[in-house]
Protein backbone atom coordinates (compact mmCIF):
# COMPACT_ATOMS: atom_id res chain seq x y z
CA UNK A 1 0.00 0.00 0.00
CA UNK A 2 2.81 2.42 0.90
CA UNK A 3 4.55 1.67 -2.40
CA UNK A 4 1.31 2.34 -4.29
CA UNK A 5 0.90 5.70 -2.56
CA UNK A 6 4.50 6.63 -3.30
CA UNK A 7 4.10 5.67 -6.97
CA UNK A 8 0.86 7.66 -7.25
CA UNK A 9 2.50 10.70 -5.67
CA UNK A 10 5.44 10.40 -8.06
CA UNK A 11 3.19 10.26 -11.14
CA UNK A 12 0.97 13.12 -9.93
CA UNK A 13 3.97 15.31 -9.15
CA UNK A 14 5.43 14.68 -12.58
CA UNK A 15 2.11 15.42 -14.27
CA UNK A 16 1.87 18.68 -12.33
CA UNK A 17 5.33 19.76 -13.42
CA UNK A 18 4.55 18.90 -17.03
CA UNK A 19 1.25 20.80 -17.10
CA UNK A 20 2.81 23.78 -15.36
CA UNK A 21 5.64 23.95 -17.85
CA UNK A 22 3.27 23.59 -20.78
CA UNK A 23 1.12 26.45 -19.50
CA UNK A 24 4.17 28.70 -19.33
CA UNK A 25 5.30 27.84 -22.86
CA UNK A 26 3.88 30.21 -25.48
CA UNK A 27 2.56 28.69 -28.67
CA UNK A 28 4.49 31.38 -30.55
CA UNK A 29 7.80 30.56 -28.92
CA UNK A 30 10.74 30.38 -31.29
CA UNK A 31 12.95 28.42 -28.90
CA UNK A 32 14.53 25.51 -30.73
CA UNK A 33 13.66 22.15 -29.20
CA UNK A 34 15.23 18.75 -29.63
CA UNK A 35 12.20 17.68 -31.68
CA UNK A 36 13.59 19.66 -34.60
CA UNK A 37 17.26 19.14 -33.86
CA UNK A 38 19.55 17.92 -36.60
CA UNK A 39 22.18 16.76 -34.14
CA UNK A 40 22.70 14.23 -31.39
CA UNK A 41 21.37 15.07 -27.91
CA UNK A 42 23.40 13.85 -24.93
CA UNK A 43 22.07 13.69 -21.37
CA UNK A 44 23.54 12.88 -17.98
CA UNK A 45 21.04 12.09 -15.26
CA UNK A 46 20.20 10.85 -11.80
CA UNK A 47 17.89 7.84 -11.50
CA UNK A 48 15.72 6.84 -8.55
CA UNK A 49 12.99 4.27 -8.17
CA UNK A 50 10.54 2.34 -6.00
CA UNK A 51 10.63 -1.49 -6.23
CA UNK A 52 7.39 -3.29 -7.06
CA UNK A 53 6.10 -6.83 -6.56
CA UNK A 54 8.06 -9.28 -4.41
CA UNK A 55 11.17 -7.12 -4.71
CA UNK A 56 9.52 -4.51 -2.48
CA UNK A 57 9.36 -7.04 0.39
CA UNK A 58 13.14 -6.90 0.81
CA UNK A 59 14.17 -3.65 -0.89
CA UNK A 60 13.31 -0.02 -0.15
CA UNK A 61 14.35 1.99 -3.21
CA UNK A 62 16.97 2.24 -5.91
CA UNK A 63 19.37 5.06 -6.77
CA UNK A 64 21.84 5.49 -9.60
CA UNK A 65 22.78 7.43 -12.68
CA UNK A 66 22.82 7.13 -16.45
CA UNK A 67 24.03 8.66 -19.69
CA UNK A 68 21.94 8.70 -22.84
CA UNK A 69 22.35 9.63 -26.48
CA UNK A 70 19.34 10.62 -28.61
CA UNK A 71 20.08 10.24 -32.33
CA UNK A 72 17.59 11.90 -34.73
CA UNK A 73 16.24 9.64 -37.48
CA UNK A 74 13.09 11.55 -38.53
CA UNK A 75 11.04 14.57 -37.52
CA UNK A 76 10.21 14.18 -33.80
CA UNK A 77 11.74 10.66 -33.73
CA UNK A 78 15.03 9.64 -32.09
CA UNK A 79 16.91 6.40 -31.56
CA UNK A 80 18.14 6.23 -27.96
CA UNK A 81 21.12 4.47 -26.41
CA UNK A 82 21.31 4.42 -22.61
CA UNK A 83 23.79 2.99 -20.09
CA UNK A 84 23.75 3.43 -16.34
CA UNK A 85 24.20 2.08 -12.84
CA UNK A 86 21.48 1.10 -10.36
CA UNK A 87 21.88 0.19 -6.71
CA UNK A 88 18.77 -1.47 -5.27
CA UNK A 89 18.90 -0.71 -1.54
CA UNK A 90 18.09 -3.63 0.75
CA UNK A 91 16.03 -3.46 3.92
CA UNK A 92 17.54 -4.11 7.35
CA UNK A 93 16.49 -6.62 10.02
CA UNK A 94 14.38 -8.84 7.79
CA UNK A 95 12.89 -11.87 9.55
CA UNK A 96 13.24 -15.34 8.03
CA UNK A 97 11.79 -18.63 9.27
CA UNK A 98 14.30 -21.50 9.12
CA UNK A 99 14.24 -25.08 10.46
CA UNK A 100 16.31 -23.79 13.37
CA UNK A 101 13.96 -20.94 14.18
CA UNK A 102 13.45 -17.30 13.21
CA UNK A 103 16.53 -15.31 12.20
CA UNK A 104 17.05 -11.70 11.17
CA UNK A 105 19.30 -10.49 8.38
CA UNK A 106 19.91 -7.50 6.14
CA UNK A 107 19.18 -7.73 2.42
CA UNK A 108 22.28 -7.25 0.28
CA UNK A 109 22.10 -4.33 -2.15
CA UNK A 110 21.68 -5.39 -5.79
CA UNK A 111 24.11 -3.64 -8.12
CA UNK A 112 23.08 -3.52 -11.78
CA UNK A 113 24.56 -2.12 -14.97
CA UNK A 114 21.67 -1.68 -17.46
CA UNK A 115 22.38 -1.09 -21.16
CA UNK A 116 19.36 -0.29 -23.34
CA UNK A 117 18.38 1.03 -26.76
CA UNK A 118 15.05 2.19 -28.09
CA UNK A 119 12.93 4.91 -29.65
CA UNK A 120 11.85 8.33 -28.39
CA UNK A 121 8.95 10.16 -30.06
CA UNK A 122 7.75 13.69 -29.34
CA UNK A 123 3.95 13.67 -29.42
CA UNK A 124 3.84 17.46 -28.98
CA UNK A 125 6.72 19.91 -28.44
CA UNK A 126 8.72 18.91 -25.34
CA UNK A 127 6.46 15.96 -24.35
CA UNK A 128 7.62 12.49 -25.43
CA UNK A 129 6.96 8.79 -25.14
CA UNK A 130 9.88 6.38 -25.12
CA UNK A 131 10.43 2.65 -25.15
CA UNK A 132 13.71 0.86 -24.53
CA UNK A 133 14.95 -2.71 -24.17
CA UNK A 134 18.29 -4.32 -23.49
CA UNK A 135 20.16 -6.17 -20.77
CA UNK A 136 20.86 -5.54 -17.10
CA UNK A 137 24.17 -6.97 -15.87
CA UNK A 138 24.46 -8.03 -12.22
CA UNK A 139 27.74 -6.74 -10.78
CA UNK A 140 27.47 -8.76 -7.54
CA UNK A 141 25.47 -11.83 -8.55
CA UNK A 142 27.15 -14.19 -6.07
CA UNK A 143 26.46 -11.82 -3.16
CA UNK A 144 22.73 -11.72 -3.88
CA UNK A 145 22.32 -15.36 -4.93
CA UNK A 146 21.78 -14.91 -8.67
CA UNK A 147 22.83 -17.69 -11.04
CA UNK A 148 22.72 -15.42 -14.09
CA UNK A 149 25.03 -12.53 -14.85
CA UNK A 150 22.44 -10.73 -16.98
CA UNK A 151 18.72 -10.53 -17.66
CA UNK A 152 16.56 -9.03 -20.37
CA UNK A 153 15.14 -5.63 -19.38
CA UNK A 154 12.51 -3.35 -20.91
CA UNK A 155 11.33 0.13 -19.96
CA UNK A 156 8.36 2.15 -21.31
CA UNK A 157 8.60 5.81 -20.36
CA UNK A 158 6.94 9.23 -20.68
CA UNK A 159 8.80 12.47 -20.20
CA UNK A 160 9.08 16.21 -20.68
CA UNK A 161 11.99 18.41 -21.71
CA UNK A 162 12.19 21.78 -19.95
CA UNK A 163 14.12 24.28 -22.12
CA UNK A 164 16.80 26.25 -20.25
CA UNK A 165 18.32 28.11 -23.18
CA UNK A 166 19.90 27.29 -26.51
CA UNK A 167 20.13 23.55 -27.07
CA UNK A 168 20.07 22.82 -23.33
CA UNK A 169 17.24 21.13 -21.45
CA UNK A 170 16.26 19.49 -18.20
CA UNK A 171 14.88 16.11 -19.25
CA UNK A 172 12.53 14.50 -16.71
CA UNK A 173 10.98 11.10 -17.33
CA UNK A 174 8.89 8.53 -15.45
CA UNK A 175 9.20 4.87 -16.43
CA UNK A 176 8.35 1.33 -15.45
CA UNK A 177 11.39 -0.92 -15.74
CA UNK A 178 11.17 -4.70 -15.56
CA UNK A 179 13.52 -7.64 -16.04
CA UNK A 180 13.36 -11.36 -16.60
CA UNK A 181 14.58 -13.72 -13.86
CA UNK A 182 18.15 -13.42 -12.59
CA UNK A 183 17.80 -16.87 -11.01
CA UNK A 184 16.42 -19.64 -13.21
CA UNK A 185 14.74 -21.44 -10.31
CA UNK A 186 13.27 -18.43 -8.52
CA UNK A 187 10.28 -16.60 -10.01
CA UNK A 188 10.78 -13.74 -7.55
CA UNK A 189 14.27 -12.91 -8.86
CA UNK A 190 12.95 -10.29 -11.28
CA UNK A 191 13.98 -6.68 -10.68
CA UNK A 192 10.96 -4.47 -11.38
CA UNK A 193 10.45 -0.85 -10.32
CA UNK A 194 8.85 2.50 -11.09
CA UNK A 195 11.61 4.97 -11.80
CA UNK A 196 12.25 8.68 -12.21
CA UNK A 197 15.12 10.11 -14.28
CA UNK A 198 16.10 13.79 -14.14
CA UNK A 199 18.89 14.71 -16.53
CA UNK A 200 20.78 17.64 -17.98
CA UNK A 201 20.56 17.37 -21.78
CA UNK A 202 22.49 19.29 -24.40
CA UNK A 203 22.74 19.25 -28.17
CA UNK A 204 25.99 18.63 -30.01
Model-derived features: positions:
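Outer-membrane beta-barrel translocator domains and adjoining extracellular loop/strand segments
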Residues: 54-61, 91-99, 140-150, 182-190
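Short glycine/proline- and aromatic-enriched beta-strand/turn motifs that initiate or cap beta-hairpins
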Residues: 22-82, 86, 191-197, 201-204
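Structural signature of outer-membrane beta-barrel domains
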Residues: 49-53, 86-90, 136-140, 177-181, ...
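Bacterial N-terminal signal peptides that target proteins for export
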Residues: 1-9
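Membrane-embedded beta-strand positions of outer-membrane beta-barrel proteins
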Residues: 42-46, 81-83, 117-119, 129-131, ...
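Outer-membrane beta-barrel strand-turn architecture
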Residues: 71-75, 121-125, 162-166, 202-204
Amino acid sequence: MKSTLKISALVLAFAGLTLGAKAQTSTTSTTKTSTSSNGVILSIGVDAGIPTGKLSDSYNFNIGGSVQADIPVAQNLFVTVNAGYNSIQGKNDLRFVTPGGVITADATNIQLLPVKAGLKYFVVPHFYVQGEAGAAFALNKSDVGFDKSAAFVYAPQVGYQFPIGGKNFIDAGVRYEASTKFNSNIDDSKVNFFGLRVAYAFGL
